[in-house]
Amino acid sequence: ITEKFKSTDIDTIRNVESDIKYQDGMTQEEYAKLEAKVNTGYRIQLSYNNCSNQPITGGNNVFSMSLTYGNTTEEYSVDNGKVGVVSQNDAYAYDIDRYNQVNGTNYEALYIYDAGEIVLGKTLYSTIQEKEANFSIDYTKNKFEKSDIRPEMYFKCDRYDTVSMKKTYFADPSGQNINYEVNFSQTLTVNTQAKDAFDTEIYRCLDYIERVIGDVTDVENRIADVEKKIANTSDQDEIASLGTLKTSLENEQQLRVSIMNEAFGRGLTMVNKCEATLNVAVAELGAKYNRLQMTQDRLSDEKTDTEEKLSNNEDMDIADAVIGLTQADNLYQASLSATAKIL
């Protein structure tokens, strides 16, 4: 699948980095050292999650990004070592600087295949913004859900059938209009493409909201477990340790709730944007219908006029027509005779 993006399509998001949890035998001092941190990252969302981390065929790449500005094109891919493939459950998946530091890598971007997201390093992000670069991303996906959009309706893509070993190429759907000639030298585009009516970003926005809600639910469950442990013990040292752990978890909860609220705000903005896109598509469809209706009315009037003229000609009385023709011929002959005498 090939998706096209602009520099303005990159989101700035916050993620909570935390390993705060109950561990048997930990002291109050050790729990006090546990701290949730918020990292700011730069993210690109693909139109799908649960993408593939392996090539579908031996001849394609798992992930590649082509950056274009001016006459310059730069490639960032798994093959050239500039992009790492990670899971959203991997440590520091959303903190590329920390990931490179811990793993001894030097990636400029992380492809989180199961989340369908790309986290950019600061250098690559700065390059895209400074150059106002456009870029395209190629990736693979081999499992589709019933609710997933059909990629060939939105993107240039290649489909590979693992049974028949047949490869089908789908061109970029942009400009695939169906035009009908509705009158002399007048054509009308009758179709509205799905990509012009239904924005794919709404699906991914909902995925993100679902994920951050899950993060909040998870920390709430950890707090509830700690409260149960506090209620079931009479050891004052353990109560103090668990109290410190609970405080740390509550701090993490506040951070995650803050991020969840931001996600809700993004969601409302996205809903308004998608609604506006759909309204424009509906309005254009209505305008097409009105133009077609006007053309139909005009052609209907022309048909009526033509049929009336034809009827007048066909329904004329033969005797009257002969008399009229004879009179016209006599007048013509008299005119010729008079002209000849004058000359």
Predicted regions and their residues:
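Acidic-enriched, low-complexity/disordered segments with a strong bias for Aspartate over Glutamate
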Residues: 9-11, 19, 24, 79, ...
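Extended beta-strand solenoid/passenger and fiber regions
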Residues: 2-101, 143-160
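Generic detector of bulky aromatic hydrophobic side chains
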Residues: 42, 138-143, 155-156, 180, ...
